[in-house]
Amino acid sequence: MRLIKLPKGKHQCLIYATAMLLDVEPSEIIEILGHDGMDIWWPELAVPNCFRGVHIQEILDVCAHFGYGLICYQVMPRTSPFGRVDMVRNIFEVDKALERIDRYLKEPGLIVTDVHACAWDGESVYDPNGMITSIQSVALKEFYLLKRI
């Protein structure tokens, strides 16, 4: 996997992570999307929250364009009765959840945290901020496993 660094001032981690995962240029992703995610949709909010961004559903379409699908695995899935946020429960015990996600991390995909996205080659995290790091350095929330469709 090739590290592609975000230009300063750009808030396009999902575009760049996807480009690394698919081994294409970010400009190809932007062309397929029809936008770069940098339109200001919420001018009352500070940077980067003011930007349109890119939704993961758009990235699913981009991957399909290249003949791939993404399968989402949440690290710690939770459930509750409808509308009862006071009754949320984890589906798995922590040990089982970590063992489960480790099985899927043997293959390439997208690493998603609450506020950032990176590419994963099955061994290392390729961070669009310009670093190659270990999975332990990331607050992983969801893993999107890349599969040929």
Each model region followed by its residue ranges:
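Glycine-rich, aromatic-bearing surface loops/beta-hairpins
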Residues: N129-I149
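Active-site nucleophile-adjacent alpha helix/oxyanion-hole segment immediately C-terminal to the catalytic cysteine
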Residues: M1-C50, Q57, D61, H65-I71
